[in-house]
Amino acid sequence: MKTSSFIIVILLCFRIENVIAHTFSFDASLLNHGSGGIDLTLLEKGGQLPGIYPVDIILNGSRIDSRDIFFYTKKNRHGEYYLKPCLTRDILINYGVKTEEYPNLFRQNSEKNRDSSDCADLSVIPQATEDYHFIKQQLILGIPQVAIRPPLTGIAHETMWDDGISAFLLNWQVEGSHWEYRSNTRNSSDNFWASLEPGINLGSWRIRNLTTWNKSSGQSGKWESSYIRVERGLNNIKSRLTFGDDYTPSDIFDSVPFRGGMLGSDENMVPYNQREFAPVVRGIARTQARIEVRQNGYLIQSRIVSPGAFALTDLPVTGNGGDLQVWVLESDGTIQTFNVPFTTPAIALREGYLKYNVTVGEYRPSDDSIEGAYLGQLTAMYGLPWSLTAFGGIQVSEHYQGNALGLGLSLGGFGSISLDTIYSRGQQKGYSNEIGKTWRVRYDKSFELTGTSFAAGYQDSSAGYHSLADVLDTYRNGTAYRSYDNRIRRTTINISQALGEWGSVALNGGRDEYRDKVKQDYIGASYSNSWKGITFAVNWSRNNNIGDYYSNSLRTENNLNLWMSIPMKRWLGGDDKGVTATAQIQRITGQNTLYETGLNGRAFGQKLYWDIREQIVPGSKYDADTSLLNLRWSGGYGELTGMYSYNRNTRQMNVGTSGSMAIHSGGIAFGQKTDDTMALIAAPGIAGASVGGWPGVSTDFRGYTLVGHVSPYQENIITLDPTTFPDNTEVSQTDRRVIPTKGALVQAEFKTRVGNRALVTLTRKDGTLLPFGTVVTLERKTGEAFESAGVVDDKGKVYLSGLSEAGKLKAQWGTNSQCYADYKLPLKKGMSGIFLTRAVCM
């Protein structure tokens, strides 16, 4: 009797879609006083009813997934029923199973998933096993290694890639600033800046544009379109097709902007070990500053950073191997400018891998005074046996031709090295043809055991060598313009070292030499570490300019920055709201030393970030001691920023807003500013649910929002925080996996149950209770399918959730026995917080 009572309690709370229970055997004749008629065979055998269960997937001893799986009943060779998982083709492909090598995998099984997908019969794969542990909620799969593909690093299988939904997209960022100078006279200025990134997704096609607008006091506003292009991925050949404005790749030739068409390999579609790197821009901001990064005069990135060292690691991958022009627009009105020289790594591809690019179009310089000219470029790289890589290309235009040839070698544990040369024939405007050549050698190595990364490069050019841009830029508005400052030699070296608990250190340096005998040396070093929550960093850089062009005051510049961050939890207790104290010392050649202290933290559920700083500059003749306040509010519809600073002579105020929008077939959704690839969260009826741990990212009043920070061609997990759900709402699974293609808007749809919770007593028309174990389902709308809800206990009661105030239930037991019941909830809930009601099943 004790056992029977315990079973009744368990089944009272039993829900087919979300269940945690123990397995017991019992005699069905002891229940319902013999009135049964219900098939309890599975329960008698210690099994469970068919349905959808959340499980952890264990493949060959490793946990690889967690998801809802549909289980159906099947008999084993002893005639006993058991639950068998429905593993669809997409699921198995996602786990790396070679489904194409087993044509009968889905032919011998007539079962289908709830979405009509075929269920696999794993017995087709020799020695494959499956074992469902209901109590542990684990599905243990054993599949021979011969039936599984080698794991791909950093990429999902191609069959899982999702082009997303069609939509109109828009990212925006608007900023305004007011600056006042108070001395003998009062001066002021206002500056406004806006960035719009509209786009359209149609299937696998992407239309993208970047337009900026600038306006300063006394000047009219100026619009600038950085690019507009149409592109799509060609998954079967791991390539990308582009029409419009873009950049040629920089693997072999220097990159140039063009308007036309391009077809080339897309490294986002291949594993990490076959990819090349994207540049990283590092620097030091004295105040809160806006960082602008330009390539060939075009703005490609704009970002607000806090005072101290910064690193931009998410630059748009345009393939430009030339210098990046970086502008640091300080909040006190000063501007830092510097170039970031970065070189592509040594070329060494895996055997059999082909990387190519074909470009045809028109040269597209940012300077309108430069005349247009057609251009064409073809490059190819191929991995040969014996760890060799052959590569070459041709670059042509109206006044230029370049031919390249090179060879790379993988040295195994000693890194990789490549050597290439380019022969050029170019005619600058007003001058005769010049013929020259350049050669370069590149070496890269990462020592995983010691955490050391090393890269070095050397390039040397003859007097007659010119790049395509050097030649075409001389054709300006009908006048001759000769380029004299071409670089003839460059040496670079980069070293980084991980020191374990002692932090990390990095060193970079190099020299550029030009035809006018000007030389530029640069060297930088950094060290960072964390100890008991205290983070500190030291950054130093030195630029040395050699040549008659520079005055003595501009020959050498040193920049030293010391920064420290101390969490205040130790002094403020557990409820510290993430308050952190910061300190900074910065010394730049020719300027007074800056000392800064500050406090920052978060409030209102991480949505508000605040930052208070005090800057002291001893000895400054301008009395530059400054107080600053920075605020940023991160909400579900975007972000708001504000800054106020003042000292004796100046006052500055900045305000800004940014966000994103998507118009799709289901309506319109807003969110914080996103990347090019994004996810549309769809959790109908659940408003205000936090998403992914990002501050302020939450669903709107309909249960929708936009999320960036998703990687194309990779598996991304989108998570909802159940602690932020409104009352009377449930989600069967709080995480979803999405694998978007580049630029896609993929939908992460969560199955929600919104409504009241009730304990319903079901009886027949004659007053007798429905049999124990009766499965009760809920009809959402007229004509809509019934949804699994719960199981009746021995007293005719069933727990249901997601109920409206009135509706219809379907009860089913035995082989063909069923009835329908109309219910209506009472006005008040019971003591337990759920409704108690009765319904007659007819």
From Swiss-Prot:
Listed Gene3D superfamilies: 2.60.40.2070, 2.60.40.3110, 3.10.20.410, Outer membrane usher protein FimD, plug domain
Subcellular location, record wording: Cell outer membrane
Keyword Transferase applies: no
Keywords carried by this UniProt record: Cell outer membrane, Disulfide bond, Fimbrium biogenesis, Membrane, Plasmid, Signal, Transmembrane, Transmembrane beta strand, Transport
A Pfam family recorded for this sequence: Usher
Claim: Disulfide bond is one of the keywords in the record: yes
Membrane topology classification: Multi-pass membrane protein
GO molecular function, one term: fimbrial usher porin activity
Single GO cellular component term: cell outer membrane
InterPro entries: Fimb_usher (IPR000015), Fimbrial_membr_usher_CS (IPR018030), FimD_plug_dom (IPR042186), PapC-like_C (IPR025949), PapC-like_C_sf (IPR043142), PapC_N (IPR025885), PapC_N_sf (IPR037224)
Disulfide bonds: 819-841
PROSITE patterns named among the record's database cross-references: FIMBRIAL_USHER
One GO-annotated biological process of the protein: pilus assembly
Span of the signal peptide: 1-21
PANTHER family hit by this protein: F1 CAPSULE-ANCHORING PROTEIN, OUTER MEMBRANE USHER PROTEIN
Family (UniProt): Belongs to the fimbrial export usher family.
Function summary: Involved in the export and assembly of the AAF/I fimbriae subunits across the outer membrane.
Record-given protein name: Outer membrane usher protein AggC
Organism: Escherichia coli
Species classification: Bacteria, Pseudomonadati, Pseudomonadota, Gammaproteobacteria, Enterobacterales
